[in-house]
């Protein structure tokens, strides 16, 4: 059975699964320097992705579209070539507690001039299915809980077992977008006009809050407003809780929440306000999930937790849940946000047919590197990994391009700017190169077996989804990757991994004794990863690009102007 999952809206992607094995997943932003979060606006993208992998639409047994906003159905308006197409889909959330696998069936998916039937499952179904089917619990045939906290929905807890899944309940009435919305009211991303939405704000705020401190008086303000505006037994609060299918109405309530907060917090620093709001939500999440577990502790698999939805990218909340001791294991896939929704749509269709089964998959299964010509003012020469390690040890950043792109929003080593972590100036230099704010962290990628020596807990974290503290005796040795609070957004990789980044780390370790490098994504500002070496060279902000055994080096070095070095807004 060959299933094609399609995510049409933001973080658009096309994925194909065959007999429980992931064949490929192409996120649109990772194609040709595409804009971040790019949607699928034209169905020709589906035809093109299939053709790249030797398939045409007739080779697909079932097409599945990820659901979106709507109480009973969602609506999509897009193109197929130059032909306008209107499609219907499933809603954002299931219509009843056991309705995760209820589909909306449609016809008229116009691909290459031919119409095809399709199914659509609720958006949350894709999150549940992608998280569980890629988890170690699915591989072992064990049930698990799955927490989905996304965009305009409250955090929802599901019970998933091979035979099916059901909603246990919503944990508390606070939509996932509340975290990013806070940034529109306080701090460097504050906007008087809040009609536009930047999907990148939440991740930036997670870094910015380290400039602040938790103030319990601020937490009390948020707690009080939450109890009266969201959780109270009043008509206004009940209407908010019941109107969950109306995204605009939910956001309006959240903006009103923060406007009321701002009136009470005029004397407080923005960084303290945001740090305190982060902790308010973290405590609420931990408290409410603990209360639910008290009522459902007898469920088999209740100590197994999967996390999905956009809030699954919050490494501090993930770590807080793991630290409660309520769970024996916590699994977060590398694509908890909507970058995993195409895979999730396909997994949802698998589950509807055969139950929730494990997916055979690899994180490095995005677009392959494209061939390209050496640009003017650049030269290319063979370069071994030991030679590359020596360049890095000389404190020279290098763009490292190898293999297929990773799935999800993290570069994970294959589309990365790498640098030695030993200089305190390197963090600022990399942030300047990327035109990022000074408070943004630079990630360490570390050999897995040595991570516990350097970080606490330092447990395996191949997808960069948990928080770690840098041990005191290492902070002066690797200052470029130590965040403001001493933490690190660690990525680990096994010494035995076939990925070339592992072999490079071993070479760097042999040269310096340090088993890690700085890593940050290699991309144009506001765009997906570089698709080829020439694109990285044309960007021109790093003098060396290593691509599959060849070192491309700039022959004419141009100094950046002061204007070029300004951080982008």
UniProtKB/Swiss-Prot annotation:
Gene Ontology molecular function terms on file: transferase activity
Gene Ontology biological process terms, A to Z: biosynthetic process
E.C. designation(s): 2.1.3.-
Function: Involved in 6-O-carbamoylation of Nod-factors.
CDD domains xrefs: ASKHA_NBD_NodU_N (cd24101)
Entry's family note: Belongs to the NodU/CmcH family.
Organism: Bradyrhizobium diazoefficiens (strain JCM 10833 / BCRC 13528 / IAM 13628 / NBRC 14792 / USDA 110)
InterPro entries documented for this protein: Carbam_trans_C, Carbam_trans_C_sf, Carbtransf_dom, NodU/CmcH_Carbamoyltrnsfr, Nodul_NodU
UniProtKB keywords: Nodulation, Transferase
Designated name of the protein: Nodulation protein U
Gene from which this protein is expressed: nodU
The protein's enzyme class: transferase
Superkingdom of this protein's organism: Bacteria
Pfam families: Carbam_trans_C, Carbam_trans_N
Xref: PANTHER family: NODULATION PROTEIN U
């Amino acid at each position: 059975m060959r299933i094609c999952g399609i995510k049409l809206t933001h973080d658009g992607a096309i994925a194909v699964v065959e007999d429980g094995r992931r064949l490929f997943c192409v996120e649109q932003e990772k194609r040709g320097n595409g804009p971040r979060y790019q949607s699928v606006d034209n169905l020709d993208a589906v035809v093109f992705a299939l053709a790249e992998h030797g398939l045409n639409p007739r080779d697909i047994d079932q097409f599945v579209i990820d659901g979106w906003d709507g109480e009973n159905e969602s609506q999509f308006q897009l193109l197929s070539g130059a032909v306008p197409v209107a499609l219907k889909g499933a809603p954002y959330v299931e219509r009843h507690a056991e309705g995760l696998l209820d589909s909306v069936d449609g016809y008229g998916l116009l691909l290459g001039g031919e119409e095809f039937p399709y199914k659509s499952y609720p958006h949350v179904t894709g999150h549940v299915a992608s998280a569980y089917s890629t988890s170690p619990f699915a591989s072992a045939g064990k049930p698990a809980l799955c927490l989905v906290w996304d965009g305009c929905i409250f955090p929802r807890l599901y019970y998933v077992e091979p035979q099916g899944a059901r909603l246990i309940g919503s944990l508390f009435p606070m939509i996932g977008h509340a975290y990013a919305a806070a940034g529109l009211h306080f701090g460097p991303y504050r906007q008087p006009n809040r009609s536009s939405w930047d999907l990148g704000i939440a991740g930036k705020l997670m870094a910015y809050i380290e400039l602040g401190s938790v103030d319990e008086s601020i937490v009390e303000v948020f707690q009080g407003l939450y109890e009266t505006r969201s959780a109270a037994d009043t008509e206004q609060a009940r209407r908010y809780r019941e109107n969950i299918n109306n995204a605009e109405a939910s956001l309006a309530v959240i903006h009103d929440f923060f406007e009321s907060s701002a009136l009470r917090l005029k004397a407080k620093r923005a960084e303290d306000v945001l740090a305190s709001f982060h902790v308010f939500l973290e405590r609420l999440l931990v408290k409410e999930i603990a209360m639910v577990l008290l009522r459902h502790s007898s469920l088999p698999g209740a100590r197994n937790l999967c996390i999905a939805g956009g809030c699954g990218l919050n490494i501090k909340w993930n770590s807080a849940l793991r630290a409660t001791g309520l769970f024996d294991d916590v699994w977060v896939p590398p694509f908890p946000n909507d970058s995993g929704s195409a895979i999730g749509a396909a997994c949802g269709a698998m589950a509807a047919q055969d139950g929730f089964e494990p997916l055979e998959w690899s994180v490095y299964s995005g677009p392959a590197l494209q061939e390209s010509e050496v640009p003017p003012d650049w030269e290319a020469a063979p370069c071994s990994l030991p030679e590359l390690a020596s360049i890095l040890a000389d404190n020279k950043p290098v763009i490292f391009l190898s293999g297929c792109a990773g799935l999800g929003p993290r570069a994970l080593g294959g589309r990365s700017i790498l640098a030695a972590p030993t200089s305190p100036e390197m963090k600022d230099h990399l942030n300047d190169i990327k035109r990022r704010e000074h408070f943004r962290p630079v990630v360490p990628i570390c050999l897995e077996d040595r991570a516990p020596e350097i970080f606490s807990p330092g447990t395996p974290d191949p997808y960069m989804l948990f928080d770690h503290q840098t041990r005191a005796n290492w902070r002066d040795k690797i200052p470029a990757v130590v965040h403001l609070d001493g933490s690190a957004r660690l990525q680990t990789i096994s010494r035995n991994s076939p990925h070339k980044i592992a072999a490079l780390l071993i070479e760097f370790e042999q040269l310096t004794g340090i088993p890690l490098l700085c890593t940050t994504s290699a991309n144009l500002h506001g765009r997906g990863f570089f698709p080829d070496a020439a694109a990285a060279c044309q960007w021109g902000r790093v003098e060396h690009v290593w691509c599959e055994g060849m070192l491309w080096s700039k022959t004419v070095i141009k100094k950046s102007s002061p204007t070029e070095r300004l951080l982008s807004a």
